[in-house]
Amino acid sequence: QSTVHIVGDNTGWSVPSSPNFYSQWAAGKTFRVGDSLQFNFPANAHNVHEMETKQSFDACNFVNSDNDVERTSPVIERLDELGMHYFVCTVGTHCSNGQKLSINVVAANATVSMPPPSSSPPSSVMPPPVMPPPSPS
């Protein structure tokens, strides 16, 4: 059975007080193929645009994206494809102030999902070396 996820729950789709609000909201949820996201926002205040790439999402780079912007609340986005999906508000500086959501969509019959990666993992950090356990003395 599919689930409708109300983005931001009672907060809705708005410029959050914390830039991590939407990533924290998504962290505790499993998004499956066939589910939907519902974005609720005041008329003319916000919009919803699905970004093509993580790079565009991270940079809030939505040049030439006017064609695909949904402006009438509530916006329902059906999750039909596996993998990462990136949603932003293209109004003013809303995206750069944290009004953006990335989610990982898993198969409808998946039993366990991994949490999505953090929005900006460090690229130059090496994992710590694996040390053998001390030998018993």
UniProtKB/Swiss-Prot annotation:
Name by which UniProt lists this protein: Cucumber peeling cupredoxin
GO terms, molecular function: electron transfer activity; metal ion binding
Chain positions found as 4-hydroxyproline: P115, P116, P117, P121, P122, P127, P128, P129, P133, P134, P136
Positions that bind Cu cation: H46, C89, H94, Q99
Residues carrying a glycan: N109
Biased composition, class Pro residues, residue ranges: 114-137
Chain spans, region Disordered: 112-137
Gene3D superfamilies, per the entry: Cupredoxins - blue copper proteins
Domain Phytocyanin as annotated: residue spans: 3-107
